[in-house]
């Protein structure tokens, strides 16, 4: 909390987002104007298989009219106080009127999850609720971000993140990877809109200079719906950064490092590793559909890292880290 919001005021979500009578009346007036103009699908949700509108504007109007009856004339903000070990969510309002969602939780396979996401820019300009940061996907539909379009260099972004990590008191995770990132939201017509470019910066636990391998999966998934095993979510620390600073942060499931199981472990030679990879790459992709046969895989880096080995049938709360080539 102090690392990000030492100067912020924290308010409960319910008190911050409650709709006043004036706000609800504005929404009702807009919906009723749509009806008067014959626009029964103002959000372009379309129709179902029977030709009926997916969005029922009349039902929505009725719901807002009911909300209006009990809505307050003005908001009364309630201060929020984080409590360790319990679910907590709030809005953090900064001195420059920018705002952040702030959530702490512990549930299921997540021993700890801390999430921060900007909700409003400086001056209080709201960011669409469905806006989310994601990695640049090298899609032909997306223009690749550049340092110029972001307005911030990678080194500057790394420095901002490093300062926050130090304030968080995290010393056993280090910078491991980065990628360009884009912030997207769906417009009123359900088309995707770009709300900015930035960087994704990841930190990973590093032991004697070797990082724990970062994976696309977050862990915590069952092998199948009938599985009864306890799942294990992975440790991660991820930031999205743009010219205005930290836009989003997720910190999950910190590990506790135990004892060394085997001293001086020997790895296969690199040439042997490459032969195994070349063989297994073909085997693991053998059942791909015909059009996948033309896919080309470009390997731009090979890294020594720790792989997580987890045996829930033996112990659902500990695992082993083994050095592997990625």
Language-model-detected regions and their locations in the chain:
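A short, compositionally biased
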Residues: 84, 321-323
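Segments that shape or occlude catalytic/ligand-binding pockets
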Residues: 160, 164-321
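Preferential activation on post-signal-peptide N-terminal prodomains/segments
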Residues: 1-226
């Amino acid at each position: 909390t102090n690392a990000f919001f030492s100067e912020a005021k924290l308010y409960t979500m319910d008190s911050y987002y409650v709709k006043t009578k004036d706000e609800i009346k504005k929404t009702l007036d807009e919906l009723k104007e749509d009806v008067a103009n014959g626009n029964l699908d103002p959000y372009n949700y379309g129709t179902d298989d029977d030709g009926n509108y997916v969005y029922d504007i009349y039902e929505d109007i009725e719901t807002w009219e009911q909300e209006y009856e009990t809505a307050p004339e003005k908001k009364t903000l309630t201060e929020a106080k984080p409590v360790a070990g319990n679910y907590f969510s709030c809005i953090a309002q900064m001195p420059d009127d920018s705002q952040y969602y702030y959530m702490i939780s512990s549930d299921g396979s997540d021993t700890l999850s801390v999430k921060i996401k900007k909700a409003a820019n400086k001056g209080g300009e709201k960011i669409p609720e469905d806006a989310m940061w994601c990695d640049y996907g090298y899609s032909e539909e997306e223009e690749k971000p550049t340092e110029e379009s972001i307005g911030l260099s990678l080194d500057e972004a790394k420095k901002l993140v490093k300062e926050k990590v130090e304030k968080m008191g995290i010393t056993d995770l280090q910078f491991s990877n980065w990628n360009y990132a884009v912030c997207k939201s769906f417009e009123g017509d359900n088309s995707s809109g770009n709300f900015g470019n930035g960087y994704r910066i990841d930190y990973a636990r590093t032991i004697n200079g070797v990082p724990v391998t970062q994976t696309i999966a977050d862990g915590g998934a069952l092998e199948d719906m009938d599985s009864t095993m306890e799942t294990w979510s992975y440790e991660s620390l991820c930031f999205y950064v743009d010219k205005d600073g930290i836009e989003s942060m997720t910190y999950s499931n910190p590990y506790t490092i135990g004892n060394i199981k085997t001293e001086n472990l020997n790895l296969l030679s690199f040439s042997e590793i490459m032969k195994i990879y070349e063989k297994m790459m073909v085997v693991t992709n053998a059942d791909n559909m015909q059009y996948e046969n033309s896919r080309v895989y470009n390997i731009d880096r090979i890294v020594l890292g720790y792989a997580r080995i987890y045996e829930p049938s033996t112990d659902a709360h500990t695992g082993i880290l083994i050095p592997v080539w990625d």
